[in-house]
């Protein structure tokens, strides 16, 4: 079977919340200023905060969101990468959960729809958010258009100019993208005054988006890291469990890339559910990131700010520091300084392994994948591909083929200019 499709009538109608199943209680956020929690209450949609700390394992997806999931391309297919399997020696089976098949071209729309819906329930004048490479920003723009909500998107400055096509997508959906740091917030003005040539960072953009929402009557929505955002995205993993069962397959490995952690967690957590509940983890879970932003392999597991402006509460997570300004790599979605607290805890317990690959290695595999499978991965997604060679090499000579499930988080059709620059195309 090359393609595993799930009928819309069979699409899961619940999300999965990992909090009740973690091996130990998630460290609580800290408010060192005495103002961070109050800021959260004002800035974030009410229902999103309820989900953030909920202990309900399988909350039902509201009907309005469920309907929009189907409108934007869900369920997404799982496709077997047979040509890549052969290239790697034929001793593993590779299945790709194709989140690139959504209208926005990535997994980000899965939570954007939920966040915007709940902001609308709060009668928000608009939503504001950050975005790195633009996948999250374009997803929020699409979700806002579908629910009739205005949106302001603070896009990391280096990506704002290097990735214009996602910015154009946002405009097409009626959104208002701004380069971050920007002149639209006092915080942005301060940063630009100190360093007018800054490439920006996701931490900076988060701070700007929060300030803009608070000062202008909007609601801030986060595109990764927080529990609720991961929860909303688990529709992908819930679908994948059904699809793999349909194919008579059970993955030995679950792999994917980490920017803030929501992409990988959304696929992996529903598979981890039964294992965590039984106390026995049998699958191998591997998350990969950018070596230029090595939070998983060189970061510390400690409390840190999720944003550069220190507006939000401190979270315990793997981090290389809230004030880290990453280099201007093309995988803008991987430039975040930390890893989601839930995923960080699992990494700290040895349940999830971590890898980091540099841009050259990742892009080499993006080229190979494109030639073998005929589909161009996003620069971020390409950072998961070197794991496949590692798995193939480690299982060479085994009698039974191992099964690998990959979160194919987005396509690279709007990133061709970046690939061209990096690979020196004419």
From Swiss-Prot:
Disulfide bonds: none
Function: The beta subunit is responsible for the synthesis of L-tryptophan from indole and L-serine.
GO molecular function terms noted in the UniProt entry: L-serine hydro-lyase (adding indole, L-tryptophan-forming) activity; pyridoxal phosphate binding; tryptophan synthase activity
UniProt-recorded name of the protein: Tryptophan synthase beta chain
Keyword Oxidoreductase appears in the UniProt entry: no
Species per Swiss-Prot/TrEMBL record: Thermoplasma volcanium (strain ATCC 51530 / DSM 4299 / JCM 9571 / NBRC 15438 / GSS1)
Subunit structure and binding partners: Tetramer of two alpha and two beta chains.
Family: Belongs to the TrpB family.
Pathway: Amino-acid biosynthesis; L-tryptophan biosynthesis; L-tryptophan from chorismate: step 5/5
Modified residues (N6-(pyridoxal phosphate)lysine): 108
Keywords from the named record: Amino-acid biosynthesis, Aromatic amino acid biosynthesis, Lyase, Pyridoxal phosphate, Tryptophan biosynthesis
GO CC, one annotated term: cytoplasm
């Amino acid at each position: 079977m090359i393609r595993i499709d799930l009928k819309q009538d069979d699409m899961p109608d619940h999300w999965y919340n990992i909090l009740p199943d973690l091996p130990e209680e998630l460290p609580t956020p800290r408010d060192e200023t005495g103002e961070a929690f109050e800021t959260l209450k004002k800035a974030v949609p009410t229902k999103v905060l309820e989900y953030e700390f909920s202990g309900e394992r399988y909350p039902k997806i509201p009907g309005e969101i469920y309907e929009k999931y189907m409108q934007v391309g869900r369920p997404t297919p799982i496709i077997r990468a047979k040509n890549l399997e052969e290239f790697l020696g034929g001793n593993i089976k590779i299945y790709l959960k194709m989140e690139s098949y959504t209208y926005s071209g990535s997994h980000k729309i899965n939570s954007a729809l939920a966040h915007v819906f709940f902001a609308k329930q709060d009668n928000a004048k608009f939503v504001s958010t950050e975005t790195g490479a633009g996948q999250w920003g374009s997803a929020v723009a699409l979700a806002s258009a579908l629910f009739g909500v205005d949106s302001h998107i603070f896009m990391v400055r280096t990506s704002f100019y290097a990735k214009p096509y996602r910015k154009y997508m946002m405009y097409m959906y009626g959104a208002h993208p701004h380069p971050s740091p920007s002149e639209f917030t006092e915080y942005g003005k301060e940063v630009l005054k100190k360093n007018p040539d800054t490439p920006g960072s996701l931490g900076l953009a988060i701070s700007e988006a929060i300030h803009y929402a608070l000062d202008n009557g909007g609601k801030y929505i986060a595109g990764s890291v927080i529990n609720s955002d991961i929860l909303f995205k688990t529709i992908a993993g819930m679908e994948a469990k059904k699809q793999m069962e349909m194919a008579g397959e059970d993955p030995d490995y679950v792999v994917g890339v980490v920017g803030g952690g929501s992409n990988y967690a959304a696929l992996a957590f529903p598979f981890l559910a039964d294992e965590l509940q039984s106390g026995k983890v049998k699958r191998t879970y591997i998350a990969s990131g950018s070596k230029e932003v090595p939070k998983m392999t060189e970061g510390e597991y400690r409390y840190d700010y999720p944003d550069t402006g220190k507006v939000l509460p401190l979270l315990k997570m793997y981090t290389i520091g809230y004030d880290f300004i990453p280099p201007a790599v093309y995988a803008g979605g991987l430039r975040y300084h930390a890893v989601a607290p839930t995923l960080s805890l699992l990494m700290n317990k040895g349940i999830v392994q971590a890898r980091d690959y540099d841009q050259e290695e990742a892009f080499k595999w993006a080229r190979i994948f494109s030639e073998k499978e005929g589909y161009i991965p996003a620069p971020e997604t390409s950072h998961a591909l070197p794991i496949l060679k590692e798995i193939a090499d480690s299982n060479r000579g085994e009698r039974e083929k191992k099964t690998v499930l990959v979160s194919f988080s987005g396509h690279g059709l709007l990133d061709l200019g970046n690939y061209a620059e990096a690979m020196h195309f004419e």
